[in-house]
């Protein structure tokens, strides 16, 4: 007679078998504006390597006809998929409403599935002219900055706090942010949604929740992936931020230059990069905000490095978060929290973290919770 233990073994085997099963996902795209009309090809960009890891021009769909494109691939059962359709760049994203960019399409793979996507517009078709920036407060632009070892120049945008021009004797802490085109202005944000950091910071400052800060957005480049990782280009990017961007900001604006008044924030690979900045250069950066950090990247290299670190505790503050619908990131987020605890970091003191159960990997959700690292880093004491 089968025992309870036997049933348990059978159940575990069944769960393992289900998780290892490969299921077929087919995505059909039928745009209203056809290739014959627009001269465009169709691409998919998303959270999986099969989707090109959010590269908008990496994975071209198979063209079946002038009005139909197809993507097919196998995925493990229960895989969480998140993607968008483009015509080769984020400036040519597929739209379903002429007034705004769509949120990511998501799918949990539980069976062989066919999705039909019917875009009504391509973004560049409805942008007849470049829209005016939509930013609260005063900003300065510094164009085409370059650094040793980097392949691309980039812009930075500097947001100044409300009292900056009136209180000419005051000096301010500085927050640096990766993916700078996405943080203030929806007209430059790659999905059409920005983080609204200008509005959030302005409100928190006027409510006297945080101290006044200068915010520096550093635009990304086509080398975003290696620049935001622990690599040769990543080291060159870090040196660029310190020796070019920070040097320019400190010489141009009234800043508090010490590490205690210098923070850095990013999301996804930018979240990974932010942790690398404070961990490798705690003499320069005293605070890091890591939203939806990609600790899985490069075979979890950063997780391993910090877990194996045996030196003195670094005097830094770290904020981490993750969304419940970011399946590939949850494990790394939770393990990093526990690793930092074992290194002596304490919640509410030099460590803070939050888990948003419905959060997805998108600017929309990062905008909703960016107030948390701002308060943790720059809250009035």
Regions found by a protein language model. Name each.
Residues 1-26:
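Bacterial Sec-dependent N-terminal signal peptides
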Residues 33-78, 88-109:
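Aromatic-rich carbohydrate-binding modules that target alpha-glucans
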Residues 79-83:
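Exposed beta-strand face motif in extracellular beta-rich ectodomains
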Residues 101-171:
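A domain-start/cap signature at the N-terminus of enzymes
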Residues 165, 226-268:
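Gly/Ser-rich "nucleophile elbow"/oxyanion-hole loop immediately N-terminal to the catalytic nucleophile
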Residues 181-239:
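Active-site machinery of serine-nucleophile hydrolases
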Residues 258-305, 311:
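Primarily recognizes the serine-hydrolase "nucleophile elbow" in alpha/beta-hydrolase
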Residues 321, 326-381:
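C-terminal catalytic histidine-bearing segment of alpha/beta-hydrolase fold enzymes
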């Amino acid at each position: 007679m089968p025992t309870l233990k036997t049933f348990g073994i059978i159940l575990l085997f069944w769960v393992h078998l289900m998780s290892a099963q490969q299921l077929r996902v087919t995505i059909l795209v039928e745009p209203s504006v056809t290739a014959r009309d627009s001269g465009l090809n169709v691409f998919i960009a998303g959270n999986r390597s099969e989707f090109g890891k959010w590269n908008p021009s990496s994975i071209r769909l198979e063209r079946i006809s002038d009005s139909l494109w197809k993507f097919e691939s196998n995925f493990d059962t229960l895989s969480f998929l998140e993607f968008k359709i483009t015509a080769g760049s984020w400036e040519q994203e597929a739209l379903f409403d002429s007034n705004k960019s769509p949120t990511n399409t998501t799918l949990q793979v539980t069976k062989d599935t066919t999705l039909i996507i019917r875009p009504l517009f391509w973004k560049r078709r409805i942008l007849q002219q470049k829209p005016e920036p939509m930013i609260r407060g005063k900003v300065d632009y510094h164009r085409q900055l370059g650094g040793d070892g980097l392949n691309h120049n980039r812009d930075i945008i500097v947001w100044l706090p409300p009292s900056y021009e009136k209180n000419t004797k005051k000096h301010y802490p500085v927050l640096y942010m990766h993916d700078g085109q996405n943080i203030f202005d929806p007209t430059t944000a790659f999905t059409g949604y920005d983080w609204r950091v200008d509005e959030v910071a302005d409100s928190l400052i006027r409510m006297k929740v945080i101290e006044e800060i200068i915010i520096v957005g550093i635009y990304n480049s086509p080398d975003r992936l290696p620049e935001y990782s622990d690599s040769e280009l990543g080291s060159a990017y870090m040196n660029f931020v310190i020796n070019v961007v920070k040097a320019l900001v400190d010489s141009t604006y009234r800043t508090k230059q010490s590490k205690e008044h210098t923070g850095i924030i990013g999301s996804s690979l930018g979240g990974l990069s932010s942790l690398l900045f404070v961990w490798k250069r705690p003499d320069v950066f005293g605070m890091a905000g890591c939203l939806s950090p990609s600790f899985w990247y490069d075979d979890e290299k950063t997780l391993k490095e910090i877990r194996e670190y045996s030196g003195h505790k670094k005097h830094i503050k770290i904020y981490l978060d993750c969304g419940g619908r970011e399946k590939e990131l949850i494990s790394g987020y939770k393990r990093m929290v526990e690793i930092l605890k074992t290194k002596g970091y304490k919640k509410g003191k030099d460590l803070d973290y939050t888990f948003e159960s419905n959060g997805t990997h998108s600017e929309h959700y990062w905008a909703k919770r960016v107030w948390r690292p701002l308060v943790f880093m720059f809250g009035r004491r």
